[in-house]
Regions:
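N-terminal hydrophobic/helix-forming segments and targeting peptides
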Residues: 1-229, 242, 262-266, 270
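Short acidic, Gly/Ser-rich segments with clustered Asp/Glu that frequently serve as metal-coordination loops
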Residues: 228-236
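A structural-propensity feature for long, helix-poor, extended segments
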Residues: 276-278, 283-290
Length: 290
């Protein structure tokens, strides 16, 4: 399932009419008088990326006008999911596979909201997947990026080293990858003293997450991502201005997990290894000294 991108519509979809900026005047001259009048009344200027809902005779939306100026890219239609009323929409355009895949991916990514702790959920417009699009690539990319965004957006109180390990286990388990975790004092036994030193003051023990997947004879690809779930600076205590965004100090770990998901989901012929040192750099009597 791809958020707000569907392969079929439950209700008749509204067309998104793509008009090249250079062709706008000629296109407009061929439109019904009602639409000409509406476009004029709205003071619509045909600049690239702008859109306008065109009314039907019953006062509903008949179609959506979109002005294209330049090549398609992943964010070409990304404003529309939030601008248009919820419902189903199709795009009438001569897409290549790459263009269709990127446009659908950008549409879905534009609907992302971190609302895990909210009761009410925002609704968006749904795009019918263009025929030329690679559905699996859209799904894979959106799921991977959503994973990365969710992990980074989680408050530090809800994602410590053990939580990052659990997220890694979920990704590894989906593709039957092998995972080992070296935790706490075992880091010293296996010669990872700095991972231990940075995280030893936290109640949630430091750990090294190690995931392997794929044919052992395939070309080796190793991804290493920093997993500092929160960074106070230890006893070299950071000021508030430098600490406010430190929940994102594990963004490297989130990114390699998202990339690993894409690699494994695509079945790429590689021997993949993912290494994530996961710690919370906290403050206590045994905190790391600078």
């Amino acid at each position: 399932m791809i958020p707000y991108v569907a392969t079929r519509a439950d209700t008749p979809p509204k067309p998104i009419i793509v008009v090249e900026k250079a062709n706008f005047d000629s296109w407009l001259s061929a439109q019904p008088e009602m639409h000409k009048g509406w476009i004029a009344a709205q003071g619509f200027e045909a600049t690239g990326g702008k859109s306008l809902s065109l009314p039907g005779s019953a006062g509903d939306i008949d179609a959506v006008l979109f002005i294209k100026d330049g090549a398609w890219n992943i964010w070409s239609l990304a404003d529309l999911p939030a601008q248009l009323p919820p419902g189903f929409y199709t795009v009438s355009a001569d897409f290549s596979e790459k263009e269709a895949t990127e446009v659908a991916t950008g549409w879905s990514l534009a609907t992302y909201v971190f609302d895990r702790f909210k009761k009410s959920k925002k609704e968006f417009a749904t795009l019918i997947l263009p025929d030329a699009a690679d559905e699996n690539m859209v799904r894979r990319t959106v799921k991977a990026i959503t994973l990365v965004r969710d992990l980074i957006n989680l408050p530090a109180g809800d994602l410590g080293p053990s939580g990052l390990e659990a997220a890694a286990s979920q990704v590894a388990g989906e593709f039957e990858a092998e995972q080992t975790n070296i935790i706490g004092e075992d880091l010293l036994t296996y010669h990872f003293p700095m991972v231990h030193a940075v995280g030893r003051a936290a109640a949630d023990a430091p750990r090294l997450i190690d995931i392997t997947w794929g044919d052992k004879s395939a070309p080796k690809v190793t991804l290493v991502g920093k997993g500092v779930c929160f960074d106070t600076g230890g006893l070299d205590l950071k000021p508030s201005s430098a600490m406010l965004m430190m929940k994102k100090d594990m963004g490297g770990a989130a990114t390699v997990l998202g990339l690993a998901y894409m690699i494994m989901d695509a079945g790429l012929p590689v021997r993949l290894r993912v290494l994530i040192p996961a710690v919370e750099n906290s403050v206590s009597g045994n905190a790391f000294r600078p």
